[in-house]
Structure formats: structure tokens, C-alpha cells
Amino acid sequence: RTNLSERGFTDTDELYRKITSVYTWDTLKRTDWFVDYQNLFTFTGVMSQRGMFASAAMEMIEAGETERAVEILDKCQSVIPVENFPLDMTMYGFANERDMVSLIEAYYLAGESAKASALCSSMSDDILVSCKFFLRHYEYAEEYFDSCYTVLGVLSSMADEYGDSALADSIRLRFNKLLE
């Protein structure tokens, strides 16, 4: 039985076939369509597309199929455009940030440190922009600022854990500069 944080058993061959051959993701990857709040909520919260890709990649990694996992992770980046589905959606309170952290960790676990680092860096850049905004309006946005702080802490800790101390230090330094 699956829930938001745990996957059930998966047939990795069938999962891989469906993600790479059956589903085309044509509509999801279009950047010329407007994605409204309801679709953001659906595709990054209720039925998280990034979460589905992250779960599939982790399942592949656990099965020892790291090449397939990387292909799934790369596909996620190509079919879920940040123009429509930003890396940082803390202001909505969806599951997106958790799913992004899972994608980054999956890249690290698959041995793709450069891709993990690039995605982690891009996400932290976006979250730092939100942090700055929420800090400016802290009286009204304390909860959102705290959410950003938490995600940045997770990202910097994960970068440290996987040997990317320069990135971890950069995230912490840039956050601390916001507080000065």
C-alpha cells in the first residue's frame, strides 16, 4: 500500500516501459499553455508528477538499475518545464519541495553528482529569492519564511552528506547574508 512518503512494490520493467514508451507527456511539457492554480495544485500536490518520477527513479536505484533511474530523472527534467512548474512553490504549501529534494537525492544516489548539484543549486537559488521576499514581509509571512529555511537546510545538509560541501556552504552563506 502506498502513501505520500512510501512507495509500494513496483515491477520496474513495466514502470520503465510506461514512463519512457507509453506515456508521451506532450501536454505536460508544453510551455505555451497557461497553468493555473488548480493545475499547479493537481500536478505538484495531489497527483505530483515530480513525485511520480522521483518514486520511479528510487525504485530503479533500489533494484540496481541506475542507468534507467538516470533516464527517468532526466525525462522528468525535460517534460516538467520550470516555466510552468517552478522548482520553488513554498508559497502554495504543496508537496513540490519534498519531491524536488527526492529528485536531487536520486541523482546523488545514482552517481550523477553534477546533475544533483546543478538541480540543488537552481532550487536553492529560487528558494533564496522567496526567502528574501518573505523576510521583507516577515510579520505576515513567517510560516512561508520558515518553510523556505527548512528546505534550504535540507538541501545544504544533503549536499554535505553527498560530498558537495562547496554547494552546502554556498547555500548557508547566501541564506545568512539575507539575515544581515
Regions found by a protein language model. Give the residues of each.
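C-terminal luminal/periplasmic domains and tails of membrane-associated envelope-modifying transferases
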Residues: R1-E180
